[in-house]
Curated annotation (Swiss-Prot):
GO terms for biological process: mRNA catabolic process. Belongs to the RNase Y family. It is found in: Cell membrane. It comes from the Bacteria. It is an enzyme of class 3 (hydrolase). Keywords: Cell membrane, Endonuclease, Hydrolase, Membrane, Nuclease, RNA-binding, Transmembrane, Transmembrane helix. GO terms for cellular component: plasma membrane. It comes from Pediococcus pentosaceus (strain ATCC 25745 / CCUG 21536 / LMG 10740 / 183-1w). Its EC number is 3.1.-.-. This is Ribonuclease Y 2. HAMAP family: RNase_Y. It holds the Pfam family RNase_Y_N. NCBIfam families: HDIG, RNase_Y.
Amino acid sequence: MATILIVVLLLASIGVGYGLRAKKHSETLAQARKAAEKIIEHERQKTKAEVAEYEKNSVQETQQYQETIDQELADDLHDNQRKEAWIEQRMNLLNQKKIVLTNRADALAKKRQSLLQERDNVRTTLGEAKQLITDRWNKLQEVADLEEQAASKLVLKETKQDAIRSKDEFVNNAQTELESSCEREAEDLIALAMEHSDVPRGQAENHRSFIAENAEYLGKLIGNSGQNVRAIEALTGVDIVIDDQEKEVILNGYDPVRRAVAMETMEMIKTEKRVVPDTIERLVNKANKVIDQRIRQYGEDAVRELKLKYVAPDLIKFIGRMHYRTSYGQNILEHSIETAKLAGIFAVELGEDATLARRAGLLHDIGKSIDRDIEATHVELGVELTTKYRESPVIVNTIASHHGDVEARYVIANLVEAADAISGARQGARSESVADYIQRIKSLEEIANKHPEVKESYAIQAGRELRVIVQPKETDDKTIHSLATNVKNQIEEDVTYPGQVKVTVVRKLEIVEYVEKKQA
């Protein structure tokens, strides 16, 4: 009985526990549903807020994008208007040039018509002269009863004189008009070339002096007992003078490339913590490489700017070296580029090869890039260099003739000579003052005039040549050689001059006798 009771109680307990568990499960499930509904509602509200925020941001971004597009369209419209104005301006300029060319063509046509009319007039005059001969012939035979041969000689003589006078008058008038026309054409051509010339007017680089930043830098530069400065001087061949009070460092040396290497070395010293002679040697080697790279880059840029065809790599290096050369303060490379552009414009106007003219203009002063310790003029060095690299005979003749030493055999040689003169003579191209120029000219002439056998002397070609006229009776052909040598040596000692000075001694003896008419 007890066992049955226990079983019944156990079953009742199990039933009660199952019921309680089911009730708890139901409550838990209900709570989970409520929590899920809250989460879903929260996410729904969050999503709704995010959608609203996104829509708001989208409107703002769309508005900003629209404003950006409107601004870009306005800028493009402004640029297009500016370009249209520029195009219209260029079209007006081209129309003006077209009008000028048309007027020039009309003037040439009128000139041709005038010459044809003049030719007809000459023919008419000749016909009248022939008729005059016939009339005079008949009149002389009738009036003077001269013989046929005598009358013929007289008539021919008078007619010949009249024809010569008419011819001379016609030739003089034509020559005067031709010279005037040529001058106008030359002025127009030069004005057109200068209008299109856009070479920068930069100053030549200063590789002669600079101010030290501080005493620490001067200490590294000078080194222990000046050993660093001496190392730089020995490796670069440049003399260095240091003013301790002004903190100025001055570089003295004829070769501007070496001065550039020395300057680059001193610039590199600034970043070195410890500087000794071994450091100087390493920096000088590095500076040499840097300057070599710059030289080649200058040459390649010049060739590329002028749109030239193949140029020998070694010749490009000589072109780049011209950047470090100056003449009266004018950078030789910039001067050569400007000369090349002017010569190219001249060539186009005259129907010549513009590319060849630009090449000749770039290379006309190439001899100035060679070391100055070589005993030769820059013209001779340039001829030798371009011949070595097989440049055109036109270019070789251009270099040889651009200072008038030899005759210019090609039109391009004359064009480069004119462009060279324009580039060097324009205002601001060269920095030598008028006072210095006049003093140098006077010094050259005074050196020659000190010699008793000298009659007079002239410094010509801006001081590039000294022409000495001697007394012919006080000298002979042998003594003038020693005179030229003495004048040359004195100029080298007493005068500071750029480039070369040519000394020319002239001895000329004229003997004139007069034959007087005998009295009858």
